[in-house]
Each structure stands twice: as C-alpha cells, then as structure tokens.
Amino acid sequence: SAALLDLETGEVHQEKQLLPVKAGEAGLRQSDAVFHHTRQLPELLERLRPFLAENPVCGVSVSTRPRNVDGSYMPCFLTGVGTARAVAAVTGVPLYETSHQVGHVLAALYSAGKLGACEKPFLAFHVSGGTTDSLYCEPDEQAALKITPCGTSLDLKAGQAIDRVGLMLGLQFPCGKALEQLAMQSRKPFRIKPVIRGVDCCLSGLENQCRKKLEQGEPPADIARFCLMTVAETVIAMTKAAQERHGKLPVLYAGGVMSN
C-alpha cells in the first residue's frame, strides 16, 4: 500500500492491492512476498502521481520492520525501504522510519478521529495474521509513539487461526471476511473458555477444536461462529489482564482481524 497526505487539508489519497495467493494456500513464502511487493509497489505509486501535480513532496515515511523490537525482520520490508529511500533522495526530503505495528496503531487512531490519544498513555491491541499483541503505548517525541509489548499469543496468532479454519471450511485466503459472513448464518450459543497465561494467550487449541467439530459433522456456519467467538473472548480476557497490570487505561483495537 502507498498513500499521500496533504498537510494543509488533511486529505489522504491511498492505493492498496492484496498480494496474490494461490487457492488453498495459507499465505506466501517470503521470497514470493518480496517478488510481489517489488512488482506491485511501482504500480501503486504511479496511480498516486496525478495528486502530486500541484503539491511538492515534503517528506517520506516507511515501515522498515514488523515491530519496534530487536530482531523484528521480514525481507519484504526491504522493498518499501528501498523505494522510500530512492524517493527521498531524488526529492531531497527527510525520510522517517517507523514500524508496521506503529503504523497500524496510528492508522486506527486516525480513522477513529482520536489522534489526540497519543498525548497520554493508552493500551492497544494489534490483532492480525502475524500478531496477537497487547501493547502499552505512550507519547514519544522522536517516534510519535513508544510501544512496549505487554501480552501476546504464545503459539498460533488470531489471524492464522481464522485462516486455517477458513481453509478447513473451503474458503479462500485471506478468510476473515468470508468466515464472518458464514458465522452470521449461525445463532448457536457456545460457552467459550479462552486459554490465558497471565497477560498472554494460547490459540493453537482452537484449530484442533474446529477440526474435531468438522469431523463430527457440525455445520460450517456453527464452526465459523465458534472460531470468531473464541478469538473475541480471548481478546476480551487479554484486555482485562492488560488493564489489571497497567490500570484502567483507554483501549484501542487495530489490525486486520479486528475488522471481523
């Protein structure tokens, strides 16, 4: 994805495109992700060019890694970093580096009209295919937002669980939207018992539970509902645990899974 922000009007122009994933597969190998990023990013930037006609570039920002923690690395980020460095060098403007996770949190605040929340500490959740994290967030003059990890999934991530269950039910990756639509066809009540370890959670059992339900002949809609309810109850339990540790701070939920 790529976007332009007009600092005078606050207007945002964005372009985004999902990376292609073959039917039946749960994601991409890193080498394939790098290839598709390299091929698609120039196309997105070209679509934004008309909005630059009367507005010079004054800065470039890029996500350089998944999270602001030591050892956080994925090769596909190099494509964006290389492109951003080239644009900044050619235009002679500053380059601002951030992380994918900080971007998710700030984007959620922006879309909710709550950017002012960055002025005080708050809790955030980043729930996606690669993370199920509770985060302690506080103001930072250099990085706009300082994020300290609080809790996480000790095994399977929420988005991984949703996609694996979705593929199990014959849905196309990424499965979140279709799984939600399927779950809405069910009204079956479930007693969910999330697995919590302090401020952390465990989700690997969810996949096994859903597979067992499928083998026992339970309707796909009921399985989809059970899957999403389990993820929701897990996040609720993690929220309570995070607030017990850090106090009753405001809570923000971000990431692809939170749209389901």
Give the role of each language-model region:
Residues 93-123:
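Conserved phosphate-binding catalytic cores of ATP/NTP-utilizing and phosphoryl-transfer enzymes
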Residues 99-102, 137-185, 208, 212-217:
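Glycine-rich phosphate-binding loop plus the immediately following alpha-helix
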Residues 16-18, 36-51, 234-239:
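Short, well-ordered amphipathic alpha-helical segments that serve as non-catalytic structural scaffolds
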Residues 62-65, 87, 128, 252-259:
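Glycine-rich beta-strand-to-loop/alpha-helix junction loops that act as flexible
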Residues 177, 181-251, 257-260:
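A contiguous, well-structured pocket-lining segment that forms one wall/lid of small-molecule binding clefts
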Residues 46, 50-85, 89:
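Short beta-strand-loop/turn "lid" adjacent to the catalytic site in phosphate-handling enzymes
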Residues 1-35, 143-149:
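Short glycine-rich, Thr/Ser-proximal phosphate-binding strand/loop in the N-terminal lobe
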Residues 1-12, 119-138:
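Gly/Thr-rich phosphate-binding beta-strand-loop-beta motif of the actin/hexokinase/Hsp70
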